[in-house]
């Protein structure tokens, strides 16, 4: 029986499952001639969650790409950086596996592994993060660390990062909590000096402190549909412990910090180790030896480094890698411009000597892969300006002389007479 008479006209209700009376529980929910208390509802939820957790990895395992598959996808879009790809593939796989199985596995709490990418300008840090988000079909947003300031100061609050992520998925909190956030220029928020100052460092150490809880995992309160916060407003609650944070930076000068640590203790005077200029380590070799203490010396606070346990270093791109970037990836620059010209019904051809010249120019500018587009854009500017007004052009050829500025691109016409007239 789920109800008993307490006295004349009084009914005492009991839970049909555990037998507790309505006075022993917080809430008793009525059904057709049955009752269930809040404690039994919670117990049922726990049982269902546990069963789903046991089934989920087996059911969803095939949907999550393996580290080998993630690496293969990155290879399609990013040239080189083999070590960084492997580190990212494992870290991303473990992160999403942790989300699918719950934060605990067999009673062991699984920690969060955010990622720090260290590499020179134009080495592919941003592209790697974008490609990962596209493969996993999760919301992705980028933030510039140089625009962030502590709360209460002019500039962007760190919680604006989560707001941008929510905007990417139409304010769907569940989707946002599975997203990826890439924070660029993270090296620019390093401490300005080792010495304490009477002036507040609101865009350096202050921002690192503000980012700590966000990166580690907290419940961020974000205004719905953007706008400023005010006391009467209801906020969206976003659990950042499920969001993967990838921080990247060029860390100019870090190689000198690493070198100082490496040579420390080698002796002085006659006992000192003498190194020739040719024996000096390259930027890539120096970055490969990076230790947490080097990042602390550079200006990142120990707590912040602790929240980024996975460190991947990217190498400088040489001329051969830049040539590969121009023609090999699925969305290679030459393929993009060829597709653009194809919309005009014109074939675009880059000769090998032209690709070599573009790569050499980018190397001279020290802009890495990022500088390739500006070079190609400048070379093709006049052609793209004139082409829509010209009739009968079937092909445009770019060679080394065009890149050097010694001649204009060669235009081949369908009609030989038009070709002859254009050559005059």
Swiss-Prot record:
Whether Chaperone counts among this entry's keywords is: yes
Q: Which UniProt keywords apply?
A: ATP-binding, Chaperone, Metal-binding, Nucleotide-binding, Zinc
Q: Which residues form the ClpX-type ZB domain?
A: 3-56
- CDD domains this protein is in? RecA-like_ClpX (cd19497)
| Residues reported in the UniProt entry to bind ATP | 120-127
Q: Which residues bind Zn(2+)?
A: 15, 18, 37, 40
One cellular-component annotation, GO: HslUV protease complex
Q: Which family does it belong to?
A: Belongs to the ClpX chaperone family.
Briefly, what is this protein's role? ATP-dependent specificity component of the Clp protease. It directs the protease to specific substrates. Can perform chaperone functions in the absence of ClpP.
**Subunit structure of this chain's protein:** Component of the ClpX-ClpP complex. Forms a hexameric ring that, in the presence of ATP, binds to fourteen ClpP subunits assembled into a disk-like structure with a central cavity, resembling the structure of eukaryotic proteasomes.
Query: What is this protein called in UniProt?
Result: ATP-dependent Clp protease ATP-binding subunit ClpX
Q: Which gene encodes it?
A: clpX
